[in-house]
Amino acid sequence: MEESKTHSISDFIVFKPTSMGSIKLFEKISKNGYVSSKDTDEWNKIKKRFKLIFDAAKVKQMKVLVDAEESWIQKAIDDLVFDNMLIYNNDYTLIYNTIQAYRYDRLDYLKQIHQKFNGSHIKIGVKLVRGAYMQKENKRARELNYKSPICKSKVLTDESFNNSLKYIFKNINDFFLFIGTHNEKSNLLAMKLMQKEKMENSSDKVWFSQLYGMSDNISFSLAKKGYNVAKLIPFGPVKEVIPYLMRRIEENTSISEQTNRELSLIRKEIERRKKVNLN
């Protein structure tokens, strides 16, 4: 956070909720819907760690993107983030919660959150992504014999993502949006929705984002047109960051498609420069 602000790298930071405490406790609270007396002390420590991050971000005038995790621990995270939005999203939208659109229930969740905040002065921060744990989610659902929370096809996931975009822009006065996608069609849709709502390209209500080193053709094109663009740089131990990136490549076909296109564009640029040098 200090590095980003000091060197004007970004106004956003990201953190993984389970880095703040026990995954088992997040799972237990998500399942039970309450904190048992025996877990109160440990849960309060987790809440305090969240607060330390949000307080530091407020001092630095930065924004915090809270990562989404597996469905069986997400409810506790959602509830904790929601409670903190009520506290911190007053002066500006400090906290953004991540919604994974590959879960078929997330559009309904988005509408529920909107309804809860409706009529208040609180602005809802949303980081909208497709999701990164598809194989893990489906595997667990099969093993434990319950219905998978994941959309049955990529087409349905795309519909879920794009419908969430449409809902947010329809109610853009109540939202601040951070769009994390390598999908060209979804990025184009967001641009069209901004035009429909007569928003400036540079509106601070909307940010576009791709992973650092991936889909640069999308990032550069958006930035050239004046849209707000951020490149996500995963930070952490190599043994954790590499699997993180591999999951996103394996489970997001848009990245694979974009990689092929980027290679094609790079080859064209190399050929163009060769011709320039020959002349």
Each predicted region: which residue ranges?
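Positively charged, amphipathic and often flexible ligand-engagement surfaces
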Residues: 1-279
